[in-house]
Amino acid sequence: MAEIEAIRRYWNTRAEGYSLKTAYDLQHAETIWLDRLRPFLPESGRLDVLDIGCGPGFFSSLLARLGHAVVAFDYTEGMLERALQNAAEAGVELEVSQGDAQSLPFPDASFDLIVSRNLTWNLEQPERAYAEWLRVLRPGGSLVNFDGNHYRYLYSAPYEEERHQPDYTDGHDPDFMLGVDPAPINAIAANLPLSRVDRPQWDMETLLALETDSIRAEVERRHFVNEQGQSVSIIKNFMIAARKKA
């Protein structure tokens, strides 16, 4: 995995700005995200939750506020430091663990729920990651992954066409980038496998081949007219949820 250390270094530089975005989301978008997670949460009871690629701990703090036991897991030490800070400000406690999402340091069947947001596109071995996540999930537990086709434009004409739309944004909000140059991660993304495939179709096919008995996907589409006057529809972001076989 030639790129993993370069990926870690980049996200360490992003930790401060990404933490500001997490604090903003916890203040302004908590209800939206709770509504998206609620179908996978019990009405009562405490779950053992693993937040993979937790970053500054958005999902970790959100779910800990509900009383669940959360392990915040990330490869980047700067992100874990911010996750602990954000948890303290939210008045909750987290367990943090540093490691590779493609090779988890947990025993089989350790968690009731696994959540992840904006991680899998970064991975060099995403199929291995999904297998690992299901390994540490308990039978009947849910894996819920939010991600997007962030670098699909490198290999797909419709996604490249979207970049020419007058209202296009690349997601790098200057208020949260704090002057960090995204060029390193842009270059890395060109060599990552998920930049080359259509998602969540790839994710569904991969998870169906593993220990799952139920898969659900929700997509956020972008519609526009390209420079040739043709109507185009692309999937920008998505949620995919899988239940491990009981």
Task: Annotate the PLM regions.
Residues E127-P139:
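A short glycine-rich, Lys/Arg-flanked "PGG" loop and its adjoining helix->strand segment in the class I
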Residues M1-G45, F58-L62, S142-G179, R221:
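Conserved class I S-adenosyl-L-methionine
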Residues L113-P126:
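A short SAM/SAH-binding and catalytic strip from SAM-dependent methyltransferases
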Residues L50-I52, P56-S103:
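Class I SAM-dependent methyltransferase SAM/SAH-binding core
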Residues Q102-L113:
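A short acidic, Gly/Pro-enriched loop at the edge of an enzyme's catalytic core
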Residues L194-E211:
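Short alpha-helix
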Residues L210, E227-A246:
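Core SAM-dependent methyltransferase catalytic element
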